[in-house]
Amino acid sequence: MKKIAIFAKVHDPRCQGVASELIAWLEARGLIPLVEAHLARHLGGRQGIVPEDIPVLADMAVVLGGDGTLISAARLIGSRQIPILGVNLGSLGFLTEITLDELYPVLESCLSGDFQVTERMMLTVSVERNGEEICSHRVLNDVVINKGALARIIDMETEVSGIRLTTYKADGLIISTPTGSTGYSLSANGPIVHPSLECITITPICPHTLTNRPIVLESSSGVTVWLRSKDEDVYLTLDGQVGMELKCGDAVHVRRAAHRTRLVMSRSRNYFEVLRTKLKWGER
């Protein structure tokens, strides 16, 4: 590994300081830091790299911040599948499981080829309007269809691999990966799914029926949701970061992505320990 991409929560002074130290550490070892352009502007005018160019150039990425910063970097890196080392400088750090104290020892191991990664399934989502695809994205966590603040419950006709599932009457719908199962889906009473599993979870948000419970599908399933509600404010949100307004008749197509996100694992803890310490899982 020669070229190391650096992403950080750009408006956080602590992240900026750690990024500056990391750049110096890499350069002292003859490595090439590729600093994302937005971050570079906060580091004394250092020349940065356009975000879209980084995946092609980098051999590895280091993300300084919280889970949101890592998720954003994962979507950007996409099909390149370079390993991502997430360093927790945020509040929760469920995905960014490497601590600041572990950063340089773990990075040394990565550079020598002695590291483990966990591969996380991603989803691709596209929106079809009047028979035409108007957008397409990849997500690591979830695809959310949600009503606006003043809208009534919405109708979402749903198919799985061409077979009718149901028409949800609810505040919204969450379609998540195993990684996303501990995010918004969990708050809506969705199941916790181990990240090594290959599946897609559909979780309704406040369904107007007692029988609409979350459902877990095999990963090869294709999910299509048609918005059937008129005159309501409805939005599509991807990983809680990218969004657009939906119109009646729009079809949202979701399927497993061809590529995965590769996260560098901490050798000092496992998934269940992270569940207990980060989410207080199993505590009374």
From Swiss-Prot:
This is NAD kinase. Involved in the regulation of the intracellular balance of NAD and NADP, and is a key enzyme in the biosynthesis of NADP. Catalyzes specifically the phosphorylation on 2'-hydroxyl of the adenosine moiety of NAD to yield NADP. It is found in: Cytoplasm. Its cofactor is a divalent metal cation. Keywords: ATP-binding, Cytoplasm, Kinase, NAD, NADP, Nucleotide-binding, Transferase. The active site is at D67. It comes from the Bacteria. Belongs to the NAD kinase family. It holds the Pfam family NAD_kinase_C. NAD(+) binds at D67, G68, N141, D142, R152, K169, D171, T182, G183, Y184, S185, L186, S187, Q241. One of its GO terms (biological process) is NAD metabolic process. It is an enzyme of class 2 (transferase). Its EC number is 2.7.1.23. The keyword Nucleotide-binding applies. The keyword Kinase applies. GO terms for cellular component: cytoplasm. It catalyses: NAD(+) + ATP = ADP + NADP(+) + H(+). InterPro entries: ATP-NAD_kinase_N, ATP-NAD_kinase_PpnK-typ_C, NAD/diacylglycerol_kinase_sf, NADK. GO terms for molecular function: ATP binding; metal ion binding; NAD binding; NAD+ kinase activity.
